């Protein structure tokens, strides 16, 4: 395979002087700032430009490695003394030829192509999405995948159509928020233009991001793939030991293996918000003996996880005064302070909380929430204090250290501990600390659940991907209960219905699908995963193992292709119709599959 390596190393001042007279006719980024490295000539895109408004004493090194239909851009920055890193941008374009859609890890981002108007349309950081983007056509083929190795610090992306000439413009912006002084920084950008199935390039780019950073995923055990019950949607903060045990008896009979006790166990206040978080002691009126309560649930054959909002210390907690001066900011909507993990005593406090709970109550794991609230709102408070008391200057690094300390301490006590994180803190860095990634909250929204699960499956490797908690009205039809379950079937399903209240016909649907999900778990959750047409909301999703092919259909009038092979084939129908058109080679036929049900074609 043809391979070319171009390496250029010039100081920012030299490069700026050298290119000061260049007008770069036809280049849309000629006036975007000072050019701090020579233009990189790419085989996959047009010229790659690196600019900075104020490079100061920082010197830039840029290199480009081409390997057929993939390229890696490497950028290094060095300063003679420690200084806040210079902001810089990387620009490139390519013709809009066959490009109709766009994908990013942002669950709120559609697949449409935005105009290139200089507005950030995709951001990422350690606990917020991933710097991973793809342009693709209308036939599930990749046109260009872009990935960045910088998964800790914030990266802003401006991606879209430049009106003049109808070109795809891509701009990645680095160091756009407060950053601790440093002497060396580096990043890599992967470009992949292979015309492969769109999700293949996403999956491989995600693996590359982990590999280039040397990340190893948190161990995943079989318990992470078992169906579970969550208290959140039905109870909210109105939880107590007796009610949870009652629900768990029903859940265990249905086949659920784990329960997550969500918010409310630590307070008698029912006003939502987080004013009473921070002390993390069970409310005695609700949970008079937490250890005995957990033991009772264990006796049912279920594991027990407890929710914590990691960074929040409520204004009405005893802990709030203890950590005065050690907050990133105060959240006046949620009535709490957000801890600054750059203080070693803050990290120790949080680690001790979870370690003690694991030991004292014999828990099986945790739902660690709101990691994405570790951020700045305005200026970094450490700057005016000259980082006093902080043993880590960079916030992202501190969050990284905190979560490593938490996960290591818990694994030392219980090697098979379960730790759940919520979308949008996802990706290779977060996979180091947890083994369950849940789709972000979308109560009652089956389509969003399906789409969020699909996105997580592409970027989570072997980590167990969970649905957002399933709920439905007790008057719902059995068919639509089945459709809700099929929309989440390619993730571990979390249920959050009030089990004591649902009618028998809904129980029957749940039991039927739990049996199917258990019997086909390897294929549904661990085998090759192919979600078709993200621009249409994934109307067809396939999972295939060595022995079977499972195809879920979510759209009326869809035609699904079934290859001629000896594998077992199952059709799952969430389309709203009672028939599916199946094509095998040149022949088509209509197969009767009841809405909300499944059928074997063998």
Which residue stretches match the model-derived regions?
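N-terminal accessory beta-strand-rich subdomains and adjacent acidic, glycine-rich linkers
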Residues: 22-209, 215, 562-570, 574
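Active-site-adjacent "subsite" loops/lids of carbohydrate-active enzymes
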Residues: 219, 226, 233-237, 303-360, ...
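Aromatic- and acidic-residue-enriched carbohydrate-binding clefts of CAZyme catalytic domains
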Residues: 265-290, 317-344, 373-400
């Amino acid at each position: 395979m043809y391979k070319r390596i171009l390496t250029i190393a010039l100081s920012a001042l030299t490069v700026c002087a050298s290119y000061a007279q260049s007008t770069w006719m036809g280049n849309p980024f000629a006036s975007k700032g000072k050019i701090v490295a020579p233009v990189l000539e790419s085989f996959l895109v047009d010229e790659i430009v690196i600019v900075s408004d104020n490079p100061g004493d920082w010197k830039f090194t840029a290199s480009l490695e081409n390997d057929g239909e993939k390229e890696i851009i490497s950028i290094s920055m060095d300063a003679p003394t420690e200084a806040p890193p210079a902001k810089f941008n990387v620009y490139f374009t390519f013709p809009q030829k066959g490009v109709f859609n766009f994908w990013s890890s942002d669950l709120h981002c559609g697949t449409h192509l935005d105009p290139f108007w200089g507005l950030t349309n995709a951001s990422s950081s350690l606990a917020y999405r991933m710097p991973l983007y793809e342009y693709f056509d209308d036939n599930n083929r990749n046109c260009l995948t872009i990935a960045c190795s910088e998964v800790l610090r914030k990266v802003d992306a401006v991606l879209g159509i430049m009106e003049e000439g109808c070109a795809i413009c891509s701009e990645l912006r680095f160091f756009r928020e407060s950053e601790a002084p440093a002497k060396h920084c580096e990043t890599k950008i992967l470009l992949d233009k292979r015309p492969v199935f769109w999700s293949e390039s996403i999956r491989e780019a995600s693996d590359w991001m982990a590999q280039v950073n040397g990340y190893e995923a948190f161990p995943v055990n079989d318990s992470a793939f078992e169906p579970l019950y969550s208290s959140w949607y039905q109870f909210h903060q109105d939880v107590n030991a007796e009610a949870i045990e009652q629900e768990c008896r029903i859940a265990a009979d249905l086949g659920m293996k784990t329960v997550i006790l969500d918010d409310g166990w630590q307070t008698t206040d029912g006003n939502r918000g987080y004013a009473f978080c921070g002390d993390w002691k069970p409310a005695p009126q609700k949970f008079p003996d937490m250890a005995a309560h957990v033991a009772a649930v264990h006796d049912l054959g279920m594991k027990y996880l407890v929710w914590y909002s990691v960074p929040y210390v409520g204004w009405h907690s005893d802990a709030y005064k203890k950590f005065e001066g050690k907050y990133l900011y105060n959240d006046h909507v949620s009535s709490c302070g957000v801890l600054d993990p750059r203080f070693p005593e803050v990290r120790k406090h949080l680690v001790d909380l979870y370690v003690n709970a694991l030991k004292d109550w014999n828990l099986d794991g945790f739902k660690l929430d709101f990691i994405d609230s570790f951020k700045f709102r305005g200026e970094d408070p450490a700057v005016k204090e000259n980082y006093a008391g902080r043993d880590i200057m960079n916030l992202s690094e501190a969050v990284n250290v905190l979560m490593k300390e938490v996960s290591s301490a818990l694994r030392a006590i219980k090697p098979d501990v379960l730790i759940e994180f919520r979308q949008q803190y996802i990706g290779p860095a977060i996979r180091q600390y947890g083994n369950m990634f849940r789709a972000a909250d979308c109560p009652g929204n089956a389509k969003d659940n399906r789409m969020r699960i699909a996105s997580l499956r592409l970027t989570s490797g072997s980590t167990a991907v969970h649905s957002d908690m399933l709920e439905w009205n007790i008057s719902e039809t059995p068919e639509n209960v089945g459709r809700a379950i099929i929309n989440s079937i390619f993730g571990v399903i979390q249920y959050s219905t009030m089990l004591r209240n649902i009618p028998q016909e809904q129980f029957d649907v749940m039991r039927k699908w739990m049996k199917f999900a258990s019997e086909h778990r390897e294929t549904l959750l661990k085998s090759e995963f192919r979600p078709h047409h993200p621009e249409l909301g994934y109307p067809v999703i396939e999972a295939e193992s060595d022995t079977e092919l499972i195809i879920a259909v979510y759209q009326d009038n869809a035609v699904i292709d079934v290859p001629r092979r000896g594998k077992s084939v199952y059709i799952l129908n969430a389309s709203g119709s009672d028939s599916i058109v199946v094509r095998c080679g040149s022949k088509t036929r209509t197969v009767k599959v009841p809405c909300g049900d499944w059928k074997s074609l063998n």
